[in-house]
Structure formats: structure tokens, C-alpha cells
Amino acid sequence: MSNLPTLATGPVQLPGTINQDTIVFIDAEVSPETGKIVDLGACRPDGRFFHSSNVAAFKEFCKGAEYVCGHNIVAFDMQYLRPVLGDGPQPVDTLPLSALLFPRKRFHKLLKDEKLLTDELNNPLSDARKAMALFEEEVAAFNELPGVLQRLFCAMLKNRPEFAGFFRCLNVQTPTFADPAGVIKRLMADRLCIHADLDGLAKRRPAELAYALAFIRAAEPADVIPPWVNTNYPATQAVLEALRFTPCSKGCPYCKERLDVKTGLSRFFGFDSFRTYNDEPLQEMAARAAVGGESLLAVFPTGGGKSITFQLPALMQGELTRALTVVISPLQSLMKDQVENLVSKGISRAVTINGLLSPIERSRALEAVISGEATLLYIAPESLRSRSILAALQQRRVTRFVIDEAHCFSVWGHDFRVDYLFIADFIKKLEDFYGANSKIAVSCFTATAKQKVIQDICDYFKQRLGLELRILATSAERKNLSYRVIHVENDADRYARLRELLEAAEGPAIVYVATVRETKELAAALTADGLEAVAFAGRMDATEKSANQDAFIAGQVKTIVATNAFGMGVDKKDVRLVVHYNISSSLENYVQESGRAGRDESLQAQCCILFNEEDLNTHFALLRQSKLTLADIQLIWNAIKSVKSRRFSISPLELARKAGLEYDELQLDTKVKNAIAALEIAGYVRRSMNAPRVYATSVAVKSTIEARERIEASPLFATEAERNEAVRIVASLISARSGYKTKGEPAETRTDWLADRLGIALPQVVAVIGKLRQAGVLHDDNDMSATVSRRQLKSASAVLGTYQNLESLLIRRLSDGGRADFNLKELNNEALAGGSASDVKKITTLLMYLKAAGLLDEMRRTRGSQNVSLVTKRSTQELEAAAQMRADLCAFIVESLKAMAQNGASAGSSDYVALSFSAVQLLRDYRQQSWLTETPVTLRDVENALLFLHRTGVLSLEGGFMVSYQGMTLERVELDNKRRYRKQDYAQFSEHYRQKVQQVH
């Protein structure tokens, strides 16, 4: 890492205040098995050094030293070296000092941890020299601090063993501050609340306060408290929150400016005031409660603007303390919409991680969470069982969970979801990991005001996390909506009435239907009749779904035909008509769906139901299909009891087959997991984190013929039966890879499903896949898929040329000191005058990409205007080189995709082509073509180029290819094999289904 100390090998001149003869720099290597010293290293500033396992010789080398200095020696080395060195030398530890004096550095390990000098790994002399170099830098950094801050740190930390040696070594004066709070206020009055309990924190949490002050003084927007500090001083984040995000009742200047929600609303979103409902300031109340650290349950009317009430506090808190807010949402489309809406406002601090993302997008989103770039993370409740999500959140400080559609907790709600019941367990895991009595606040949002649902939500968090939810509710009515029920005789009459409504509509319309098939059929019929419409459903092709949604929101298409997966969080205020082609499954769903009309309260909108008595039968049939019966759960319980281990990993398919259940593939996963949830609620089992395994990420052959040749040439497959079995497995994988998205469903590469479909035992499938890797048929080359338009590929050069010209224009603006302030419209006019096919959206797309790629350090857009401020620490030469490399890579990738589109089997009459390719192979091909290029190109550069092509619309990245096993981790709690799952255990689910029937009625 560039910001780590350089290696010092010769004589070193320490600051004049330090006697060079009094300090030795040391490091010890200790066997973790025996706890005995196996190697020692030491050096002195005059150039003398020691490297041996001889303890007596080491003691002699250190003789006469008043101080021994090393990295992490107080917590580690000294417990082994104190018996050797005696009580004489005082330790000086560079690790806690590094975190205090270089708070912007994320990591504080020595260079060996970066694996850059492999020949020096575990070399204690090398580490001692690095500690000496780091100590020099720390002394220099300390001397650059204002004198009053030096003395303040000394006063707070001089009695702590990890810091005492440093201050004594530097002979820092140790004043006794009668009023440390006053000193801090004078230093940082504009950066923290002057009414915070500074005196109390200085007494109770001196180290944490020191780290917090250092961070506040030095940090920039993307910085986070170093993980080492959070691990070893876990209360630091709480101290930071107390200083910077706890509004005082007295209203100090800092709190008035930085913690006032109305000021924040204007600064982040450009609004002067919050919305009210029947003169109730519900939005403002919810935002203030969150800023005040309260847990809450807010009942908002559909279209009531709830998003801003949790986005605003999250953005304010993230800016001031780098805390992360996690938003749990059941719909992937909602997450995408909300993140894109924030991006369109110039807010780049929100990301989502969901199944619609390509592997590159997912990887970048995780990076943004870990690095501190993101302050808002949107995920689905099922993602909480992902170990990678847990690991990412453990590296940040989550201070609030926002639960959207909170009625999903309750069996009395219209959309009970078992995945919601794991939320409290996950929050508890994080709290336990953070330690220091860390409490994570919760904000729940729902549109249902059913008292039983509200009680269930409050009871859940009270019983599971000890949280009291403040209830905020309004009885506001949507006065700009009118409702009609239109009776229809048959399907022909239904369609005719729909056409009449659409022809008379004064603006955009949403038509809700019951099934995915109906969305496509009805949209096609309307378009054929001259009423252009697009389809939208949760299980549609991701590219088509996204394109259709974008076209409707942008006003390019007037009508969208959708299932109820569409609409939540969609920022379209001018919808004038919502038609339920079929009745909704519940009154709550109907209120929510119809409420997507007329979000602009100045517009009148219609909500119509086309109703026939037979419609009810359709809903009852769907309910019967999805119902989980008592007998189903009993069979799943019997299957679990048949497993010998108390704790084990098993996939939903394996468990269903073991139970003798033949579910439809689309329902199997949900039904099995619901059955496990029922058993967990009743205390029979405990389900914890998922246990996935990935066996390969690419197929290294282009055809089954090539695969057979490699298999037959390999000695790993001894018999003809083994070879045939291997060919069958590879053929399925190749078919799955090449068929990705062509059938509107994901590639089937799960090992348990492969075993089931091919009639081969799962252990045998896994064994064959291992041999296929050894034979070079399967690799880890990151196969991925993309949908491209032949038309778009032809015009790609022009599109990329436009972006290249825009980037050149931006770089010229940034050349003066790495900062630029400009107006988007004016910049666009300048680009147009220069002959570029520019528009403001393209400029915004480019800016957001450059920010995400790390080429821009800061980007601020004045809310409600087109004014933008940019800051970069890159030189003009670096920016130009990065732009040129990306342009070359993009051009190469486009030509490669053109060749694939022309040569591939998918080259039919359709404009859209589904392609599979490997990012690693693209890198190899590019390096082979560009072997004379001086600048080395990495896999990340290729991924960045693919991401750029995706964001500029040249291609649409889809999911990756993985041969995997998706296991659930289960543990039996009830160990009595005679115990049966009983009717009284099923009561909660029985009530849920009774409620569903009642809701249809």
C-alpha cells in the first residue's frame, strides 16, 4: 500500500527530543500451537540489528534501552517478552498510534499483511524495521498537530498502557485540564454538539473519545472508522454518534445547522417543507424521530412519501458519522427504483444488492458498503441469511434497520412472509458482534392500520430485541382519487371496457392483472389495437422488465400492464388511471395498488375494478395452490428427524425429496422454507445462515463435442460409464449457460437439481464436477451473460464517442486544481456546440460512473438545480490515461460481442441477442492483441469497462454462471423422535390462511 512506511535499513535520525540510544524496535514470532518464541528481530536507529531465536542474545541487544517499540506489542509481543526483558523498558506501540494519528487510513497492519513482499513474510527483523519507519511517521504526524490537541491527547491517554510509552518517550508535557470539554469545544465547536457530555466521555471513554476526535478532525466523506478501532474500541462509534448525531434540546449552532431535518430536506432533496396529511406533519415527525435515535412504526398512506422519511436521516447520519442504514424491502424492483431515483438527484450514497444484479454490480455494491461509500443499503429479507452480506455489515457500523412493508411480520397482515421473522435474529448477531452494548434502532413502515397487525409488529421487536416502537399514524384520505366498480359479463366485455377506459384516460395508466402470462398477452393485444402498452412482472426477463419500466416512467409508453410486483416506490406522480383487470387478492392490496394513482395531489385520478363473480374462484384456486398444509409440515419434520446429525446442511430440493413431496419447481423453494419456518416458530428446529458452495464459475469448452474430447483424453474417467456420466453433466451445464435468459428463466446449474434431473446421486455429481475441474473442462473464469441489441452494437462506436468527448470536456474543467463547479445545462450546451450528441442524462450517467470508479473523490449536486461541484485528487494525465484505457477496452469488447452475435446460435431475427462470455477470457484476448501496450490491464479494468458499457446502455449485464449448491443450515431443537408436529403448532398458519380467504371475500 502506498501510504505504508518505506523500509528503513540504514542509520535513522530520530527527532531531537528522542535519545537514539534509549529505544529499540522489536518483533517476535510465536508458535500458535506451543506459545513459545520461535524467532526474534530487533533494530536500533544507529543501524545495528538483531535476527535470531536466541532469547539471551536478544536480551543483550536490548540492554540499556528505556523503550521497546513495535507493532501491536502491548497486546501481543510483551506478554511473551516481559519475562525476558524484565520490568525495565517501557513499550511503545505503533498500532494504536497509527489509528489515532492516521485516521483516514482504513487498515493499520504492517506491509506483510498485504502480501507484497512474500520473501519477508514472518520475518521479525523486517517487521521491526517497518515499525521503526512507522514510528518516525507517527512522531512527525504528532508534531504537526496543534499544541493544544497534542496536550489534550496526552491528558486523556497518558495512563493507558498502549499510549503511555509514546508520550513519555516524546517527553510530552502532561497538563491537567480542568475543563477538557472547553478545550474540545474551542477546537471543534463547528463539528460537534457543544452540549454533548464531553467531560463524562473524557472520564469514561478517553481512548474512544480521542479516536472520535481524530476522525472528526481529519475524515473526508468516504472515510469510515478503521475496522481495527471498531474491534478494539467498540464504543467509538457510539461516542461519535453522541458527539455528532444526538440533537441537543438547547439547539446549539451545530445541531441547528447539521441535525435539523428541514435544513437537511432542503440540502439533500431541494424541498422547502415536508408533506402533511390532514394537517398532521407525519413525514417530519418520522424523520425527527429517526434523527433522535428512536425506533418507530409509521403507518403511511400509499403514495404518502414514506421513502424520504428514512432516506433523509440515513443520508444525514452517514455524512456525519459514516453509519450505515439497511433497508429491508420485499421487492427487487422497488430497490432498483429508489436507488436510481436518488442517483438522478445526484445522491450516490445508496446501493442495492439483489438478484437482478450482474456479478460485477454485486461486487461493486459490496465494495461500496465495506469501504464507506454507501450509507444506504437496500436488500431483500432473504439476503440476511447470506454470509457475504453478514461479513460486509460486520465491517461497517449499522445503526438502523428500516423495514418496509412491515405488515409482512404478521399472520393477520395480507402478505405474511416468513423471511421477515429472521430480521431480529440477524440484528442480534450484528449487535453481539459490535459489542459494547450496541443497540440498533428500527424503523417500520406499513400502509395498513389494522390494530392486530400493529400489535404483532410491536410485540415482535419488544420480545426479540427489547425495542419499544413509537407509533406514528394518520387517518388521511386520498381526496384526489375516485373509485368505480364496473361489472363485466365475460372476457370480451372486460377487454372492451378496458379499452374504453384507456382511450378516455387523460394520462399514464397502470393495469393490474393476476398472472405473468396475462401481462404479456394483454399488453400485446392493446398494442395491436393501437393502445401501446408494455408488460411488467416479477418473474419476467430482467432486461425486458427494466426497459419496460423505464419506458413507462419516462413517458415513452402510456400504459403498463403489471402484476402487483410493480409500483411500490416507483417515482411517477402523474398516473391518472389504475385499472384492476382482475380483483385484488385483498382489500389491503387493492388500497395499496390503487394508491399508485394521483401521487401528485393536484391531479384527479380514477381507480377502476372490472369485476365478474367468477374472479373470486381464480383467487381461491391460487390460494389452494400456494397453501402449506399441516400434512406437508409433518412430512418435512419427519424428513428432518431421519437425518442422523443434529446440525446439518441440506437444500430445499433434497429435503422435499426426502419428505416425499412433489412440489412444482417454482413453488418448491418457498414451500419448503415456509415449512421450516413453521417448525422454527413452534420450537422444533432452528435455521441459521445459508451454507452455499461454489464449484466453478465457467465452462472452458464451447461444445459438448469438445468436452467429450477432453474427458476421453483424461485418465480421471476410467470407464465408459464414468465418461458418459461426465458428458451428460457437462451437456446440461453448457445448455444452461447458453440458454441463460433465452427461455425467460435462470440457468440451472445447482448441483442438487442436476442430480435430480439426470438421475445421478448428488455425491456422484459433486465428485464428477471435481474431476471436470481437474480435466480443464470447468474453471473459475467468471462466465457471465449479457443481452445486447444488434442495433445498439452497430451504433456503439458513436455512443462511446459521445461519452469520450464529454469526459474530455470534464477533464479540461478539472485541470485547474482538481476542482470544477459548473451547470449541467451549460456544459451540455457546450458539448452540443462542439458537435457531440449530448444531453443532461448522459452527463449525469458519466459523472455517476466516474464517482463509482473512484476517479472522482467528491461530487455534489445542488438540490433543485443543475449546479454540480466535482473534486478529484487525480492528475489530468491520470484521468486522461484512465479514459483512454477504458475507451480502448470498450471498443475491443464491443467488437468481440459483435463477433459473438454474428457467430452464435442465438443470431436469429430478434434484435436482442443473449450472449455468454468470460471476463477472464476477454482479458486474455485483449492482452494478446495489445501485448505492446505499456500500461498493464487488469481484470478489474475489464470489469470496469463492462460496467461502463452497461451503464451507457450499450449492453445489459445479467447474472453470472455458477455451478453451486445452495444449502440451508438446520439444527434440531426438539430431539424427541416421537414428537409429532401437531394441530396446535399449526394454529398460526391456519389463522393466516383463514385470513387470506376472508380477505378475498
Question: Where on the chain are the PLM-derived regions?
Answer:
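N-terminal accessory regions of nucleic-acid-interacting proteins
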Residues: 1-21
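Conserved DEDDh/DEDDy metal-dependent 3′-5′ exonuclease domain
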Residues: 41-142
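N-terminal cofactor/phosphate-binding cores enriched in small/glycine residues
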Residues: 31, 36, 40-43
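Acidic, Mg2+-coordinating catalytic module of metal-dependent nucleases/exonucleases
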Residues: 110-202, 212
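Interdomain "pre-motor" coupling segment immediately N-terminal to P-loop NTPase/helicase cores
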Residues: 201-259
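Helicase motor core with emphasis on the C-terminal RecA-like subdomain
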Residues: 252-269, 281, 285, 291-307, ...
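C-terminal helicase lobe
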Residues: 505-519, 524-535, 544-564, 570-1001
